[in-house]
């Protein structure tokens, strides 16, 4: 059961009811929560493009609580974050795992935050293949290319050497918010929203 709260606002013209996500969008807040897949990515991309077109001089706030998901869907969000002019502030609430860790680390420099009890998980991409031997080889080659690409992004975003990223993503590597700051994936731990600019 998916319940989306409704917010009622008063104006001189009467009352207006919004779903909570539409109301947050008015304040340039986008919620990325749950597994990253095509439908969610399309919604996030559309919101980023809309807010950038509305005013590219104002920051966009992307709150992330996600176990990760489909790499190509995540890369659509990543590319859009870099494509638009507006700075995207990223804030981890809960968990930013796998592809979500790439996204949270890709926020505007100096504007990547985590709440005190949030976590970041980095690891290598996973996938599966079946079929003929040549199809399995093609899939294996592709996942190695994907891993190299994601490790490169994490290295660029964190300032860590690629060799450290490769070693740390060999297995699940959990980081508290403060550890993610020390690692270079985040810029600060937020106790309250006073750090948001």
Swiss-Prot record:
Reactions the enzyme catalyzes: Hydrolysis of proteins to small peptides in the presence of ATP and magnesium. alpha-casein is the usual test substrate. In the absence of ATP, only oligopeptides shorter than five residues are hydrolyzed (such as succinyl-Leu-Tyr-|-NHMec, and Leu-Tyr-Leu-|-Tyr-Trp, in which cleavage of the -Tyr-|-Leu- and -Tyr-|-Trp bonds also occurs)
Protein EC: 3.4.21.92
Subcellular localization: Cytoplasm
Listed GO CC annotations: cytoplasm; endopeptidase Clp complex
Keywords noted in UniProt: Cytoplasm, Hydrolase, Protease, Serine protease
GO biological process terms on file: protein quality control for misfolded or incompletely synthesized proteins
Annotated GO MF terms: ATP-dependent peptidase activity; ATPase binding; serine-type endopeptidase activity
InterPro entries: ClpP, ClpP/crotonase-like_dom_sf, ClpP/TepA, ClpP_His_AS, ClpP_Ser_AS
Protein family according to the UniProt entry: Belongs to the peptidase S14 family.
The protein's name in its UniProt record: ATP-dependent Clp protease proteolytic subunit
Gene that specifies this protein: clpP
């Amino acid at each position: 059961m998916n319940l989306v709260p409704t917010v009622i606002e008063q104006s001189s013209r009467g009352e207006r009811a919004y779903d909570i996500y539409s109301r947050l969008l008015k304040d340039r807040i986008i919620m990325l929560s749950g597994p990253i897949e095509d439908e969610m990515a399309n919604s996030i991309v559309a919101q980023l493009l809309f807010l950038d077109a509305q005013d590219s001089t104002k920051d966009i706030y992307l709150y992330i609580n996600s176990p990760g998901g489909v790499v190509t869907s995540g890369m659509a969000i990543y590319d859009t974050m870099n494509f638009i002019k507006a700075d995207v502030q990223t804030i981890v609430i809960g968990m930013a795992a796998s592809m979500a860790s790439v996204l949270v680390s890709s926020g505007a420099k100096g504007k990547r935050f985590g709440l005190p009890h949030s976590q970041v998980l980095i690891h290598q991409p996973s996938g599966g293949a079946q079929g003929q031997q040549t199809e399995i080889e093609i899939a294996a080659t592709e996942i190695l290319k994907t891993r190299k690409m994601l490790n490169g992004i994490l290295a660029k975003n964190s300032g860590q050497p690629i060799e450290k990223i490769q070693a740390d993503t060999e297995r699940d590597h959990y980081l508290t918010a403060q550890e993610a700051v020390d690692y270079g994936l985040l810029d600060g731990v937020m106790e309250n929203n006073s750090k948001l600019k």
